[in-house]
Amino acid sequence: MSSGNFQLLAGLGNPGSKYTSTRHNVGFMALERLAKKESVQFAMNKKIFGHIANIEIGANKRKLLMPNTYMNESGRSISAAIKWFDLEINQILIFVDDMDLPLGKLRFREGGGSGGHNGLKDIIKHLGSQDFCRLRIGIGPPSINQGDRKQKTIPHVLGKFDQAESKVITKVLDKVIKGLEVIEQYGLVKGTSFLNSSLTATDG
């Protein structure tokens, strides 16, 4: 069981300008916003197949990782980082998009399956375990018509947020940062409760 002492915060996404600000890259967006807040830059680390940055949350130092693999190969970077930094599986937190959650909804969970997400699926395969923490960030479903949902999934996740959606996501990512601070200051239970609560008018 995790104590909330996350040494590695990893966001999932696809590398390259083609995928910048797409729904599937909201995990990257969370880390980029956190790095911007802390005025730090990412640098490529070829040994872990990803871009890394160092930040401080409260009095504690943390590492941010954006895999330079494509989404479906995220596990290669995550597993390499765990070995390189000599971490335990309960010391990592994965930020990932979830189209089964309404836009703006957050869901923190320790353990569980991939939920059909190929990035999580690859991480589970490489680690040989699903007992890691993940923060799912809701991007909303592609269509209310479930009959053509599968057909619209790829265009949806690789599409960009519109102006109204972007405003919601900005508030959500600010809430993610606040949630990490709550975890550092008050512990995982209170932090999880904060993250899983609905957005309010005062958020962001």
From Swiss-Prot:
UniProt entry tagged with the keyword Lipid metabolism: no
Residues the record lists as binding tRNA: 19, 70, 72, 118
A GO CC annotation recorded here is:
cytoplasm
Q: Which reaction is the catalytic activity of this chain? A: an N-acyl-L-alpha-aminoacyl-tRNA + H2O = an N-acyl-L-amino acid + a tRNA + H(+)
Can the keyword Cytoplasm be found in this entry's annotation? yes
Q: Where is this site: Stabilizes the basic form of H active site to accept a proton?
A: 97
InterPro entries, per the entry: Pept_tRNA_hydro, Pept_tRNA_hydro_CS, Pept_tRNA_hydro_sf
Query: Which residues of this protein are annotated with the site description Discriminates between blocked and unblocked aminoacyl-tRNA?
Result: 14
> Any idea which UniProt keywords this protein has?
Cytoplasm, Hydrolase, RNA-binding, tRNA-binding
Q: Which residues form the active site?
A: 24
Q: Predominant location of this chain?
A: cytoplasm
Q: Which domain of life is it from?
A: Bacteria
Q: Which GO terms describe its biological process?
A: protein quality control for misfolded or incompletely synthesized proteins; rescue of stalled ribosome
Instruction: Name the EC number(s).
Output: 3.1.1.29
Q: Where in the cell is it found?
A: Cytoplasm
Tell me one GO molecular function of this protein.
tRNA binding
Task: Name the family the entry cites.
Answer: Belongs to the PTH family.
Task: Describe, as the record does, how this protein assembles with itself and its partners.
Answer: Monomer.
Entry function: Hydrolyzes ribosome-free peptidyl-tRNAs (with 1 or more amino acids incorporated), which drop off the ribosome during protein synthesis, or as a result of ribosome stalling. Catalyzes the release of premature peptidyl moieties from peptidyl-tRNA molecules trapped in stalled 50S ribosomal subunits, and thus maintains levels of free tRNAs and 50S ribosomes.
Q: What name does the UniProt record give this protein?
A: Peptidyl-tRNA hydrolase
Organism this protein belongs to: Prochlorococcus marinus (strain SARG / CCMP1375 / SS120)
Q: State the encoding gene.
A: pth
